[in-house]
Structures are given as structure tokens and as C-alpha cells.
Regions:
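Buried hydrophobic packing segments
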Residues: 34-39, 149-156, 190, 213-220
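Mobile "lid/hinge" segments at catalytic clefts and subdomain interfaces of large enzymes
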Residues: 44, 161-257
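Glycine-rich nucleotide/cofactor/substrate-binding loop typically near the N-terminus or early
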Residues: 40-128, 187-200, 204-207, 211-214, ...
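Conserved phosphate/anionic-ligand binding catalytic regions in large, soluble enzymes, centered on
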Residues: 21-36, 137-159
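Glycine/charged-rich beta-loop-alpha catalytic/anionic-binding loops adjacent to active sites
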Residues: 15-20, 127-138, 172, 195-201
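General beta-strand structural signal in soluble alpha/beta enzymes
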Residues: 23, 109, 135-139, 165-168, ...
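Short, Lys/Arg-enriched N-terminal segments with co-localized hydrophobic residues
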Residues: 9-15
Length: 258
């Protein structure tokens, strides 16, 4: 009888445990990879994903993204297929906050989205030697970054993890092309945001971690380090648009109980 009672107690205790997220990034992380992995962990369909996107309230984002199966080196995962009109808008942080505030996103998702863009704005202000109010986002102010950040925030807050654990981030040298011309990897905004973040070098070239993704990780309170002791409940593999020949590709997402 005692054994039966203990088993029931253990099951009830497991059910009451709040789930956490573990993220491992052997080849880096980008905003679209965050969106993809979190969508898989949250178990949302493409129809549900479209509803989240529409809740942002930006007409150009309507019907712009689906999550599809994708494989690299015959290892299957998922990838976000994103189709957006080309823009030349250089948005200020205030304009982005106004978009978020006017959206129909849940309050928690709005707050997380704005924290991510605030971290990014502070980094850009440092890089360009101006005030946060004077920052004009280029790539990060484009529709895809608003999409990645807001949808990832909606999915993350829907899961509502007790803890968020992330591996140290891979870094490499190389050249990145952007609106400012040729930049060294990591790009300046990432360089500024890396303070306090554990990293390690990899045998590759180019951009492994995007500014949008790093700002989101910091805004979401990611704890960088080794695997925590946990029990895996579900997992997903998210691919980005870049394939590294010398690295294991994809980011691995895990829903766990601690």
C-alpha cells in the first residue's frame, strides 16, 4: 500500500512541476530559429501560428510564415518559410514599441517583445555613439525582426517556462555584409550584447548569432551554461537559412521538468 501511495504521490508531483526550456545552439541561433523551435515546443499548427502573426496588427505580415519539415545532411527538423515584401523603413525604438502596444498580443508577450527591442536599442546606441531615442534600426527594424521577436515572445510566454537554460554561444571570425558595409564577425551589436555571456570558438566563418536572437535570449532571462539535471518531455530541432559545413547544424529545443 505504501508503494502504491508513493507512486500516486510521485505522479501528482510530476504533473504539478512547471516545465522549463533547454536550448542548445551548436551552430548558433537566429530569430527565425527561435520562432521555429518555440512553435514546435508549443505545439501550434500553421493556422494557429498565422493567428499569432495577425495579432501583431501589421498588414504586410499577413500569411507570411509557415513552419515546414526540413533536413540538413539527412537529419530532419523544421524551418520557418518566411515571405515578406522588401522594405526600406528605418524604424526608431518608439515606432516599434507603438506597433507592439497597438497589437493584440497578450500583455506578457508585449512586455517580452519590448524588453528585447530595448536591449537591442541600447546596443545600437552604444555602437553608433548616440542616444537610444536617436537609434534608427536597419535590418533589425525590418518586418522580419518584428515578426521573429513578437511571435517568439508570444510562443515563449504561452509555454511560460519556470526556467530557460541555453548553451554557451558559438563564435567565429569572418565577414558579414549589411547596410553598414562589411563588418567583422561577431557584428558590433552582438559584440556589445555579449558582455557576461559565455562563448566558445568554432571552426567556421560568418555570423553564428544574430542581434535579434541574442537580444531575445537576454530579454527572456536565459541562463547560459551546461545542461541542467532534468527530465525531457518534448524536443524539436530548428534550422535556419545558413548551413555550416564544419558544424553540426540546427538548434535543439527541449521542454523539460526539473
Amino acid at each position: 500500500m505504501w508503494c502504491h501511495s508513493d507512486t500516486q504521490h510521485d505522479r501528482k508531483e510530476t504533473q504539478l512541476k512547471r516545465q522549463s526550456i533547454v536550448l542548445r545552439t551548436p551552430s548558433g541561433i537566429s530569430g527565425d530559429m527561435l520562432l521555429t523551435g518555440l512553435a514546435q515546443l508549443a505545439g501550434v499548427s500553421n493556422a494557429e501560428l498565422s493567428a499569432i502573426v495577425d495579432s501583431i496588427g501589421v498588414d504586410a505580415l499577413h500569411d507570411c510564415v509557415t513552419i515546414e519539415p526540413h533536413h540538413v545532411n539527412w537529419i530532419t527538423g523544421h524551418q520557418a518559410r518566411i515571405s515578406l515584401p522588401h522594405e526600406h523603413h528605418h524604424r526608431t525604438p518608439k515606432l516599434i514599441y507603438d506597433i507592439i502596444d497597438a497589437s493584440a498580443l497578450p500583455h506578457a508577450a508585449k512586455d517580452l517583445s519590448k524588453r528585447a527591442f530595448a536591449i537591442l536599442a541600447e546596443a545600437e546606441a552604444t555602437v553608433h555613439g548616440c542616444s537610444v531615442e536617436e537609434v534608427h534600426f536597419h535590418e533589425v527594424g525590418a518586418l522580419d525582426s518584428i515578426l521573429d521577436t513578437c511571435v517568439a515572445a508570444a510562443l515563449f510566454t504561452r509555454i511560460d517556462p519556470a526556467e530557460f537554460h541555453c548553451s554557451p554561444l558559438p563564435m567565429c571570425d569572418g565577414i558579414i555584409r549589411c547596410e553598414h558595409g562589411l563588418l567583422a564577425s561577431p557584428p558590433p551589436a552582438v559584440q556589445d550584447m555579449l558582455t557576461g555571456v559565455p562563448v566558445y570558438g568554432v571552426d567556421a566563418s560568418g555570423e553564428t548569432v544574430t542581434p535579434t536572437a541574442l537580444a531575445f535570449l537576454k530579454a527572456a532571462g536565459a541562463r547560459f551554461g551546461k545542461w541542467p539535471q532534468c527530465e525531457v518531455v518534448a524536443s524539436a530541432r530548428a534550422y535556419g537559412g545558413k548551413v555550416f559545413e564544419t558544424l553540426p547544424n540546427g538548434a535543439n529545443f527541449f521542454l523539460v521538468t526539473m
